[in-house]
Design a protein with these regions (language model features):
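A short acidic, Gly/Pro-enriched loop at the edge of an enzyme's catalytic core
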Residues: 147-156
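Bacterial N-terminal signal peptides that target proteins for export
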Residues: 2-13
Length: 242
């Protein structure tokens, strides 16, 4: 074989190796394990955690229950979000917009993208926008594998009591990491999995250790943890950058 053919053969082998790496998918520790579902979970495991069932739009009234502000101190939650007036914020798993609208008052020169995978929830948000005249909340249909947000387009994303339901947490996490600007932050609010006294089903809670493991696998740093709420962690993760 002459030198030219040898070079071409080696280049072909290199390209084949690169190609196989590119299509190999996520690293081994972020692969999913599938088993039979049970009463609480879908039978899909991610980094040792079983993913819970999704609460559908039929549960919208529970999200808006009158006791929620006192039970969860949602006022403290909103006040704890590290926001600036001109931020573009994504409320992931926005549901009825329970948090989207009060957060919008904290970013008067910015906007809140209320992202949900259920069109019925977005219809509720659209109705609330029309009734209230709010101009800086935008409903956005997300997917189970992507939040459908542009790259480097948001300053902060927050997820309240929903991340544990994501059927594709690795892919969704990648999408959020890419959507955040350098230095942007992801705020994860989850019921404390370490606390047996929190009256929530096991798979609807998460420990700070588990959340940190999953977010760091995506490239985030953190978490900075604020335990100012009666039942939930506030976990702040940062995308490296400015």
């Amino acid at each position: 074989m002459n030198i030219t053919l040898q070079v071409r053969a080696r280049l072909g082998l290199i390209l084949l190796v690169i190609s196989s790496i590119c299509v190999a998918g996520p690293p081994a520790e972020t692969q999913y394990r599938i088993t039979a579902p049970d009463r609480e979970g879908i039978g899909k495991f991610y980094m040792g955690r079983q993913i819970s069932y999704v609460m559908g739009h039929q549960g919208a009234s529970w999200l808006e229950r009158g006791s929620r502000r006192v039970e969860e101190r949602t006022d403290l939650l909103i006040a704890s979000l590290p926001l600036e007036a001109d931020f573009v914020v994504a409320d992931i798993g926005a549901g009825t917009g329970y948090f989207s609208f009060p957060v919008a008052t904290r970013v008067p020169q910015g906007r809140v993208l209320a992202v949900d995978i259920q069109p019925e929830m977005l219809e509720i948000i659209s109705s609330r926008i029309a009734q209230s005249g709010t101009t800086n909340v935008e409903p956005l249909l997300g997917g189970v594998q992507s939040p459908n947000l542009a790259i480097n387009s948001i300053d902060l994303a927050f997820i309240v009591d929903a991340y544990h339901e994501f059927s594709h947490p690795f892919e969704m996490g990648q999408g959020l990491f890419e959507a955040l600007k350098p230095g942007g932050q992801l705020v994860l609010i989850e019921y404390r999995g370490e606390d047996a006294s929190v009256p929530i089903k096991r798979l609807h809670k998460m420990t700070a250790q588990q959340a940190g493991k999953e977010m760091r696998a995506l490239g985030f740093t953190g978490p900075d943890m604020l335990d100012v709420l009666p039942q939930q962690h506030i976990l702040i993760f940062t995308k490296p950058g400015e």
